[in-house]
């Protein structure tokens, strides 16, 4: 059976059971397993572990405000197997700025697995995504992902907003 919840924190839960008939002198075999699959899109409101990155929630849709100087946010227990890059869905608030984005494993100073830039040209309400390639993570473990954002342009008052973060899988050959 498959179930999914509506709204944020969407998880697909797959539950399966198996029982055979057994045979003369043998007990039936049975087993059960559950797998929970998270959505590959995290909305801004779901990203609660952050430093110097504020939540702007006046529209009931939730956005994260890029930091004035630097800041980070953290996603817990993410399986990055098969992920080639992430996309930050951004919305300009009308003032130009340049931002450096780093992706680190398990801690603020952890292994650097991706680095990119977001250049906000200052066009008000323009949606522009920042795509950052990720070095392959092949250990099949769950990791905490730290996303560091550094503003190259200081004193920007109308900083861009993050609507969501999307994990993009590698293309299969």
Language model: regions and residue ranges:
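Extracytoplasmic
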Residues: 1-173
């Amino acid at each position: 059976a498959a179930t999914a919840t509506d709204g944020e924190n969407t998880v697909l839960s797959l539950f399966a059971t198996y029982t055979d008939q057994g045979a003369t002198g043998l007990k039936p075999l049975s087993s059960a397993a559950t797998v929970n699959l998270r959505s590959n899109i995290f909305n801004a409101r779901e990203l609660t572990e952050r430093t110097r990155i504020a939540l702007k929630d006046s529209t009931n849709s939730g956005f994260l405000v890029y930091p004035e100087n630097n800041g980070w946010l953290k996603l817990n227990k993410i399986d990055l197997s098969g992920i080639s890059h992430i996309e930050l869905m951004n919305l300009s608030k009308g003032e130009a700025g340049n931002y450096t984005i780093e992706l680190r494993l398990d801690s603020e100073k952890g292994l650097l697995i991706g680095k990119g830039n977001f250049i906000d040209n200052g066009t008000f309400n323009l949606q522009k995504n920042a795509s950052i390639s990720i070095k392959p993570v092949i250990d099949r473990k769950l990791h905490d992902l730290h996303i560091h954002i550094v503003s190259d342009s200081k004193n920007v008052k109308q900083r861009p907003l993050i609507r969501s973060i999307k994990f993009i899988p590698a293309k299969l050959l």
